[in-house]
Amino acid sequence: MPKYEIMTILDPKAEMAIIDNLLKTVFGDNSTEKLRKLETTNLAYSIRKSKIAQYFLVDLNAPTNLIEEFVRRANITREIWRYLIVNLDSEKGLNKKPKIRERNRKYTLRRDRFDKPNFRGNPKSRFDQQDQQATKNQQNFQQNQQNQASQYRENSRQNQDDFQQVSSNQQNFGQNQQNQSGYHRENNRHNQENMHQNNKNHQNQTSQTQRNRRQYQPIKNPKFNQKEKENYNNKKPQSSN
């Protein structure tokens, strides 16, 4: 049967009987023999607006199904804020100390973090470092100059393309204006010619109508002589019987 170590964090106002009754209900009466309260009361972070709590630790042997039942009951118990279950057969418990590592040929002692490393294997003079820094700065400056020049050329090319596009648009606009002006002038000329022709036709038609009226109108004026009257009557078309 696997061995477990269970640590629970309870509300600081809760009683020890809560965890005691829970362990007896799930694991039996003998499960609380190794139950003890830890001295630690501070929390790493606030739980339910509280920075202190009660810590309880217990070691026991139990099957997996009882551990699941304990988890279920602990989740529905309001006074139990947190819990941690450790399988001692596969993991290290909270009270166990780590074993001292055996030193062998493959193990080297780790350097203390306060010890300064030794960088004297390849010492360099201050002048060499300055020369290297100056060379690096010069390379960076040249690289920046090249980048700026390439960027300036790219911007100039883009501006030239934009200017050509604007000029082309202006030319197209002027051409369209000229085409529209010529089209309007041509339409106006055709309209004027048509209007003049219509007026001329109307005048001709009016003149012809007036002549026809004068030609076929009977003479009623007594000033005309008899000869003119006969000539007029002879010109008048005879109606067929």
Curated annotation (Swiss-Prot):
GO biological process: translation
Compositional bias segments (type: Low complexity): 130-151, 161-182, 194-210
Coiled-coil intervals, chain numbering: none
CDD domains registered for this protein in UniProt: bS6 (cd00473)
GO molecular function terms noted in the UniProt entry: rRNA binding; structural constituent of ribosome
GO CC list: ribonucleoprotein complex; ribosome
Entry keywords, A to Z: Ribonucleoprotein, Ribosomal protein, RNA-binding, rRNA-binding
Sequence ranges of Basic and acidic residues compositional bias: 109-118, 183-193
Region annotation (Disordered) ranges: 97-241
Pfam family, one: Ribosomal_S6
Composition-biased stretches (Basic residues): 97-108
Family indicated by similarity: Belongs to the bacterial ribosomal protein bS6 family.
Record NCBIfam families: S6 (TIGR00166)
Cited HAMAP family: Ribosomal_bS6
General function of this protein: Binds together with bS18 to 16S ribosomal RNA.
Protein's recorded name: Small ribosomal subunit protein bS6
Species this chain originates from: Mesomycoplasma hyopneumoniae (strain J / ATCC 25934 / NCTC 10110)
